[in-house]
Amino acid sequence: MEVTDVRLRRVNTEGRMRAIASITLDHEFVVHDIRVIDGNNGLFVAMPSKRTPDGEFRDIAHPINSGTRSKIQDAVLTEYHRLGELEEVEFEEAGAS
């Protein structure tokens, strides 16, 4: 299984969420609402989840092994950092320093 596309939208919120992503797996299956979170130990990817009636969050979809989780996290965070670099270049080109 390969992550064949990542669509990412940065968000400006008061909390720790930095972006929301959608990934495509093997050009055949899309997972929406993956969140990039700024945690205590750096950025990490949180899979889509739903709040249960007792207030807990349960994943709607998630990888079942660490190798797949790493592939997803690496692809999403690579795109997150790439977009950050593009925004910095656009900011500099606009004349701000």
Curated annotation (Swiss-Prot):
Keywords assigned by UniProt, alphabetized: Cell cycle, Cell division, Septation, Sporulation
GO biological process: asexual sporulation; division septum assembly; sporulation resulting in formation of a cellular spore
NCBIfam families xrefs: PRK13259.1 (NF009749)
Main function: Essential for sporulation. Interferes with or is a negative regulator of the pathway leading to asymmetric septation.
UniProt cross-references to HAMAP family, sorted A to Z: SpoVG (MF_00819)
Family assignment from sequence similarity: Belongs to the SpoVG family.
Protein name, as recorded: Putative septation protein SpoVG
Record organism: Bacillus cereus (strain ATCC 14579 / DSM 31 / CCUG 7414 / JCM 2152 / NBRC 15305 / NCIMB 9373 / NCTC 2599 / NRRL B-3711)
